[in-house]
């Protein structure tokens, strides 16, 4: 059973990488370059979900926001654009979950107010944890993020990278679970005005989530088939290479 995430007291840090990571946070142009890349990756993967679900092309209003991403001059402006992209995506979420027993309505968290939001919140936590594990295998410091500001919450870089993979791992797992009727109302519990997966529900979700992580797709960049789990690790190394000016970073986009 999933209990929690344990991480080392000391990271596998490299002095040069740490200084470059801090430099890319302090210098706005360098920070914005990375932050925009995360949002572009997120946007394209959200659009992939919509396009492959049979939703009419004219109903998809995400890709035009690429100009707003490029025009954003501050992280705050970019976060507003990102929120708008998510809002457009969530308008179609009930079509994606394809289950009249579980209505999305709107995004709610802390606490999630219904079953679909419970799935999203739990799945996102799983993703944050898995990306964090990937970061610990690199020389990057997870406390320095670019889209999500470095602050007292601790780790932020894992939140940045997760934006790219949540649509194609977490959301796809949710669509399969709801579409195949693998969960029922009995797999949830109500606690302090929120709705959460119970123990049996968590087991079912984790099973589908891990299946999605192991799913292999063709990576044009690598020229071979890779699991999403390996792609997530590769994404971390790509960011490290960008910081060291080995190769410019381009986010993973599922095509």
What do the PLM-derived regions correspond to, one by one?
Residues 1-14:
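Glycine/small-residue-rich interface belts in oligomeric ring/scaffold proteins
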Residues 14-255:
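Active-site helix-to-loop segments that bind/position phosphate- or nucleotide-bearing substrates
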């Amino acid at each position: 059973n999933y209990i929690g995430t344990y991480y080392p007291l000391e990271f596998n840090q490299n002095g040069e990488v740490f200084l470059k990571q801090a430099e890319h946070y302090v210098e706005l142009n360098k920070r914005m370059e990375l932050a925009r890349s995360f949002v572009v990756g997120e946007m394209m993967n959200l659009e992939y979900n919509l396009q492959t679900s049979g939703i009419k092309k004219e109903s998809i209003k995400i890709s035009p926001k690429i100009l707003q991403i490029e025009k954003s001059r501050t992280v705050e402006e970019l976060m507003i654009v990102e929120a708008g992209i998510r809002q457009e995506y969530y308008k179609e979420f009930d079509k994606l979950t394809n289950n009249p027993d579980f209505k999305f309505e709107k995004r709610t968290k802390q606490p999630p107010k219904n079953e679909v939001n419970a799935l999203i919140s739990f799945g996102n936590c799983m993703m944050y944890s898995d990306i964090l594990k990937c970061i610990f295998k690199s020389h990057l410091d997870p406390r320095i993020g670019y889209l999500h500001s470095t602050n007292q919450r601790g780790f932020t870089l894992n939140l940045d990278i997760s934006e790219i993979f949540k649509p194609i791992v977490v959301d796809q797992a949710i669509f399969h679970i709801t579409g195949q009727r693998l969960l029922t109302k009995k797999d949830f519990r109500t606690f302090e005005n929120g709705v959460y997966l119970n123990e049996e529900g968590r087991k079912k979700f984790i099973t589908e989530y891990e299946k999605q992580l192991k799913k292999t797709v063709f990576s044009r960049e690598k020229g071979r088939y890779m699991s999403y789990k390996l792609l997530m690790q590769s994404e971390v190394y790509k960011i490290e290479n960008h910081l060291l000016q080995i190769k410019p970073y381009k986010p993973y986009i599922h095509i």
